[in-house]
UniProtKB/Swiss-Prot annotation:
Region entry Disordered, spans: 66-111, 130-165, 180-229, 277-303
Alphabetical UniProt keywords: Phosphoprotein
GO annotation terms (biological process): nuclear mRNA surveillance of meiosis-specific transcripts; siRNA-independent facultative heterochromatin formation
Positions with biased composition (Polar residues): 92-111, 143-156, 204-226
Sites bearing Phosphoserine, chain numbering: S74
UniProt biased composition (Low complexity): 182-193, 290-299
Designated name of the protein: Uncharacterized protein C7D4.14c
Length: 551
């Protein structure tokens, strides 16, 4: 590769180091004090004024000569000359070399409105040519305050300078701010009575405009303040140090979600121990003494803090599991709500409860001792069927005739001839009612939950769908829509309405006749596939979400 020029390499290094300092945030570590900043601006101003030093010297020498010759009798001029600081008389400022040479170009400054070189050059060019601006040479002469000024002169001469004087005053104001503006020193007199000898000393080279300010810049804050008005906002180095680079976003408040992570089983294993759970900000709980637990449970002492939920701030335990149930626990949206009944004393949080014996599939030989019932009717009877009186668990099984309007023969055995003997069926097809929130129904809204909370009453096959869904074969979305069986029967000729196994509602419905076992079977063989509780729950869930034929 070609070697990079050393100057370019230097520039690259500068850029890279600057970028690194910015990335590491080092440029924010420096505070620039106000006086340092003022000094920097002052030095920059001197730098831009440096070209004027030679011109200023000549003008001052000429002024001094003229003043000494013509105005020896004037005390004002002498006192003014004495008041002028020595650094101005000697020409140039004492600290004008403090800035390094190559920092800024000599012709201009970065500060807007302080680009004094350019302004003065334009003033020089315009005012040294009286024809261009209409200024007379009398107006260009440096001002000397004498007590002997006469007010004679023609009006034509004085009217033109007035406009230019206003212009001069405006430019001076904009250059130096209010502090710098001294009208007696800036504005030339309206009279043209200055002695003519003075005009001889003024040449184009030695001209110094009247706007030059004769007070030392060391005490000057006006020009700096003025430049600050026009400067952009200060760099981040001028701002106070912040430890964090960006302000952190507002924190969200803690919201408690009851979660198994917070639940730990205790050492004994039969008590539910909740060590710590997050509580959302709420009103502080009342002190222990005011709680009415002593009146409600006089014999039971207050539970120790181990069994209580403690918030992060270690405030007073707001939920006590042992003997009280605050209202917030009963409310299902409160942060401390526990989604299982507290009345169960020896509650263990198991995702999958263990199988008891009666929930398992039996062999045929012990069905007389414990009989799992495949029909809900036998389970929900007040007195279970005694197997001593009958040889078969469902003695009248296929001997009865269904009324023609009822398809749901699954719910019916020989023991029932009408729906009135059944408990209210809370099945899927009761669409007009929504289940009450705290009712004693199971989650899927089937039958009332039994005391042992088993799924035995779900052991029947689901009822036949009477309303066609979009997942059935009838819908045009079904893949089997065009491949239906065209059934031929004496009652219903070929019809395009019913799909596979979906025949009109009468007794010869293929599914109904298949589900009922003929009387010749003496062994207990359930006709529908028999599941244990877990398979059954799974199957029910699956059949609720998919159509019967979507295997």
């Amino acid at each position: 590769m070609d070697a990079v020029e050393p100057s370019v390499e230097k520039e690259y290094k500068k850029i890279i180091s600057f970028r690194d300092t910015v990335f590491e945030g080092k440029h924010q570590q420096f505070l620039v004090p106000n006086n340092v900043r003022l000094k920097f601006l002052r030095d920059r101003l001197h730098k831009s004024l440096k070209n004027f030093d030679s011109v200023k010297r000549k003008v001052e020498i000429a002024n001094d000569e003229g003043n000494n010759k013509l105005l020896k009798s004037s005390p004002k001029a002498q006192t003014r000359d004495e008041n002028t600081p020595s650094e101005f008389k000697n020409g140039g400022f004492s600290n004008r070399e403090s800035m390094s040479e190559n920092c800024f170009s000599k012709s201009s400054t970065n500060l807007p409105r302080l680009d004094i070189n350019r302004d003065f050059n334009s003033l020089l060019n315009s005012q040294t040519k009286p024809e261009a601006t209409g200024l007379m040479k009398e107006d260009i002469t440096p001002v000397v305050n004498t007590s002997k000024q006469s007010s004679t002169g023609t009006q034509e001469e004085s009217s033109k300078p007035e406009k230019s004087n206003k212009l001069l005053a405006k430019s001076t104001l904009s250059l130096y701010g209010n502090q710098a503006f001294n009208p007696s020193s800036v504005l030339p007199s309206n009279s043209s009575s200055t002695p003519k000898e003075n005009k001889k000393n003024v040449n184009k080279e030695t001209y110094q405009p009247n706007t030059f300010r004769r007070s030392p810049l060391k005490n000057d804050t006006g020009s700096v303040e003025l430049s600050n008005l026009y400067m952009p906002s200060p760099p981040s180095s001028a701002l106070p140090v912040s430890l964090v680079s960006a302000p952190s976003p507002p924190r969200a408040t803690n919201v408690a979600v009851p979660c198994l992570k917070h639940l730990e089983s205790s050492e004994q294993g039969n008590n539910l121990l909740i060590n710590k759970a997050f509580t959302s900000p709420r009103l502080p709980s009342p002190p222990q003494s005011t709680r009415p637990s002593s009146t409600r449970f006089p014999s039971v002492p207050l539970s120790d803090e181990k069994n209580s939920i403690v918030s992060v701030k270690n405030e007073e335990p707001s939920v006590i599991l042992g003997n009280q149930s605050p209202i917030s626990d009963l409310h299902p949206y409160s942060p401390s709500w526990i989604p299982y009944p507290k009345e169960l004393q020896s509650l263990q949080v198991n995702r999958i409860p263990e199988l008891s014996l009666e929930n398992n599939v039996m062999s045929t030989r012990d069905y007389k001792d414990i009989m799992p019932h495949p029909r809900p009717s036998a389970v929900l009877l007040d007195k279970p069927v005694s197997l001593d009186q009958t040889s078969h668990p469902f003695p009248h099984q296929n001997t009865y005739i269904l009324p023609p309007g009822i398809r749901n023969s699954v719910d019916y055995d020989g023991t029932f001839l009408s729906r009135k003997s059944l408990p209210p069926y809370n099945g899927i097809h009761r669409l007009h009612e929504s289940p009450s929130q705290f009712s004693n129904q199971s989650r899927y809204n089937w039958e009332p939950i039994l005391e042992n909370r088993s799924l035995l009453h779900l052991n029947r096959p689901p009822p036949i769908e009477t309303h066609y869904s979009y997942e059935s074969n009838n819908s045009s979305f079904s893949p089997y829509y065009h491949k239906r069986h065209r059934q031929i029967s004496p009652y219903y000729p070929t019809s395009s309405v019913y799909g596979v196994y979906e025949s009109p509602p009468h007794m010869s419905d293929s599914r109904i006749s298949r589900q009922h076992m003929p009387l010749t079977h003496t062994t207990y063989e359930p006709s529908a596939p028999y599941y244990n509780d877990y398979e059954l729950a799974e199957e029910i869930e699956r059949r609720r979400h998919h159509s019967f034929y979507d295997y």
